[in-house]
């Protein structure tokens, strides 16, 4: 009987360790996916001045009655997304980066709902926000 109990304990320890490792890998995957997504959007769309990006930010600039010019709006959002991506890549600041990603994606989603309309960028923002929220939920006990 005692060997069966030891085997059961050994199995449970192993499975807990495996679950822990699986969670760590999932958290790393989420951080990498969100960071790569934000860096791609910043570097290849906003900083490069792709036609679609310029058109979206021109529309947003007109929506706020020209208070923020299109280049400042586009490059500023690209810079912010770059900072958030870097924060997500650093383990000690990943929760801050995820929180900022949630706030930023909320603004992006609202701008798509009220001004820009729905499309691939809207779906992308939803996915980034969902992943950032999942990251925050999975790491909430670590922050206490």
Report each predicted region and the residues it spans.
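Membrane-interface extramembranous regions
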Residues: 2-144
């Amino acid at each position: 009987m005692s060997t069966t109990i030891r085997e059961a304990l050994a199995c449970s320890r192993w499975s807990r360790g495996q679950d822990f490792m699986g969670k760590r890998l999932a958290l790393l995957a989420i951080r990498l996916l969100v960071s790569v997504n934000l860096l791609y959007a910043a570097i290849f769309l906003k900083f490069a001045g792709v036609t679609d990006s310029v058109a979206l930010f021109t529309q947003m600039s007109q929506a706020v009655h020209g208070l923020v010019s299109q280049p400042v709006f586009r490059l500023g959002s690209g810079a912010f997304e770059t900072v958030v991506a870097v924060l997500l890549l650093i383990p000690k600041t990943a929760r801050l980066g995820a929180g900022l990603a949630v706030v930023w994606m909320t603004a992006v989603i609202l701008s798509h709902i009220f001004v820009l309309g729905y499309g691939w960028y809207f779906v992308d923002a939803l996915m980034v926000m969902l992943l950032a929220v999942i990251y925050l939920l999975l790491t909430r006990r670590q922050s206490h």
